[in-house]
Amino acid sequence: MTADAPVISGSSVVKLARGVRLHEDPVRGQTVLLAPERAMAVDDIAVAIVQALDGERNLDRIAADFAEKFDAPVEEIAEDVRTFVQELSVRRMLEIVQ
């Protein structure tokens, strides 16, 4: 984590920054998160997290929704969601709403 990156917690409400979007790359057969002058390959789990970042629900709510949907421990999912979102924050691909 860099000094410039805000701390992400379960109460954080975030959405993708302007100009950042998911893109299917048919040539490589993978999904990438595109931002101005940079890209990040993402797997199916990351795609699900990115799609859930609606700027309305906090990360704890998103994790609880995933835990219910996938019948998995909420604590484990919450940690994975926060870690991935922190990485997006460091890469300046997010906007913190609250």
From Swiss-Prot:
Q: Which UniProt keywords apply?
A: Plasmid, PQQ biosynthesis
What Pfam families does UniProt report for this protein, alphabetically?
Answer: PqqD
Q: Which domain of life is it from?
A: Bacteria
Q: Which GO terms describe its molecular function?
A: quinone binding
Kindly list the cysteine pairs connected by disulfide bridges: none
Alphabetized InterPro entries for the sequence: PQQD, PqqD_bac, PqqD_sf
Q: Which GO terms describe its biological process?
A: pyrroloquinoline quinone biosynthetic process
Q: Pathway, according to UniProt? A: Cofactor biosynthesis; pyrroloquinoline quinone biosynthesis
Say which family it is in.
Answer: Belongs to the PqqD family.
What HAMAP family is this protein classified in? PQQ_syn_PqqD
How does this polypeptide assemble, per the annotation? Monomer. Interacts with PqqE.
Question: What's this protein's function?
Answer: Functions as a PqqA binding protein and presents PqqA to PqqE, in the pyrroloquinoline quinone (PQQ) biosynthetic pathway.
Please report the name of this protein according to its UniProt entry.
PqqA binding protein
Lineage summary? Bacteria, Pseudomonadati, Pseudomonadota, Alphaproteobacteria, Hyphomicrobiales
